[in-house]
Regions:
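Terminal presequence/propeptide segments associated with secretion/organelle targeting
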Residues: 2-4, 11-14, 18-416
Length: 416
């Protein structure tokens, strides 16, 4: 089956350089979709792209975040579908060597049979979005870089704190296009999350990492959670008195499946896109960052597999982390191979040459050239600092050390 692909993100929490959307494939914010409406229609989209810009309406309002994974409501009673590996931590939490849901799978025949998800599991339902760009950036252009950074960070924290004064909600001030835009995202934080279904590894991990990140796939890569809230609809901790959350919107699964050439669009919360990075950043990514990280992940995976043999109780406890590491390593390896195959660095270099020629062709654009040169220099400085941070961040990855570090940081933040 060969389907036309286009990835549309419900929210991009990260940074990128601003540029018009032009490619048929790739990752876009919903606000960009009307800009490529003709291309979407040609590819097979039957909906009005403008309808996809409302993240609290249908259908985008059915898409939720698990804090690190995307998911969707698929019933009026809070049933949520996500990827198998996204629920793996909860399956692992409820498994033992004697009662191994990872190996055998799990199905709750009734709501009463559903299992509490792993501690800390959350479902975030976006309820409101507000443009706060002016409030965050006002007066910062005249500041020094250090003062500008401090001011923006403090304003983002202040706005977040104001938003979270309402119980049951978590808020985030997301940066877009390298700080050109800021959006306040208000989300209901569902804290009572229960496991409904997870496939056995023979289904959910069929093909192992050979099939992962590739198409076509033959894996049953899905699992179900259910969101629960207090009887009054507010967010609440786990309680037998809680009731299934009634989402404003949910998606219906098309049992007919796909036909060859069908249009496919995926909406989710992937974190960030690097579509608009400069040549210097692309080179650093594929010459150092990705290869170094891939090597580190490979060593980490080998260490876990050696010290926690297959079938041991230790392996059960490490399964979720091992799956995540393999998932990430395969992704990095694929990106490195793909970039080399398509000549990404050379293509990006040619694009920047074309941009330089376009600037040079008109005196009115002359101010752009020094700005781009300054950006390239800053990219090199940033890459140097990032390498130091890379090793620091990974040196503190062990679970106990990471937890201790986070607790210490949070205790200090409470003092401020």
């Amino acid at each position: 089956m060969k389907a036309t692909k286009l990835l549309a993100t419900a929210l991009l929490v990260g940074s990128a350089l601003a540029a018009p959307a032009s490619a048929k494939e790739g990752m876009f914010t919903p606000a960009q979709l009307p800009e490529i409406a003709d291309q979407l229609e040609e590819a097979g989209l039957e909906l009005d792209p403008s309808d996809l810009t409302d993240l609290t309406g249908f259908p985008m309002g059915a898409v939720v975040s698990l804090g690190g994974c995307s998911a969707s409501f698929v019933s009026a009673e809070g049933l949520v579908v996500t990827n198998d590996h996204c629920a793996r931590g909860s399956v692992q939490y409820n498994s033992t060597a004697e009662n191994n849901y990872l190996e055998n799978g799990f199905l709750a025949a009734t709501k009463g049979d559903e299992l509490a998800a792993a501690p800390g599991s959350r479902i975030y339902v976006t309820t409101e979005l507000t443009d706060v760009t002016e409030r965050v950036r006002e007066g910062t252009l005249e500041m020094s870089p250090v003062d500008r950074y401090a001011a923006i960070e403090q304003r983002r924290k202040d706005i977040t704190a104001e938003c979270e004064s309402e119980p049951g909600f978590r808020c985030l001030v997301a940066s877009f296009y390298g700080g050109a835009e800021y959006t306040l995202i208000k989300r209901l934080e569902v804290r009572d999350v229960r496991l409904v279904y997870a496939p056995a590894d023979s289904i959910g991990k069929y093909g192992g990492d050979i099939d992962n990140w590739q198409w076509p796939r033959h894996t049953g890569d899905f699992a179900f959670y259910r969101a629960y809230v207090a009887p009054d609809g507010s967010a609440a901790d786990f309680s037998e008195d809680n009731v299934p959350y009634a989402p404003a919107h949910h998606l219906k699964v098309n049992a007919a499946g796909l036909d060859d050439g069908d249009f496919v669009m995926v909406a989710g919360y992937p974190g960030s896109t690097s579509r608009y990075t400069l040549l210097a950043e692309v080179k650093n990514t594929f010459d150092w960052t990705y290869p170094t990280f891939q090597g580190l992940l490979t060593d980490w995976i080998a260490t876990i597999e050696e010290t926690a043999p297959e079938g041991s109780d230790a392996r059960v406890k490490y399964e979720s982390r091992l799956a995540g590491l393999n998932n990430f390593e395969k992704n990095l390896r694929g990106q490195i191979d793909g970039a080399r195959r398509v000549g990404l660095v050379d293509r990006r270099a040619a694009r920047e040459v074309g941009l330089a020629e376009w600037i040079a062709a008109d005196e009115a654009r002359a101010d752009y050239a020094p700005a781009i040169e300054a950006l390239a220099e800053l990219s090199i400085e940033s890459a140097t600092a990032a390498r130091t941070n890379f090793w620091y961040n990974n040196a503190t990855r062990p679970a106990l050390l990471s937890a201790a570090q986070r607790l210490y940081r949070l205790s200090k933040e409470r003092e401020l």
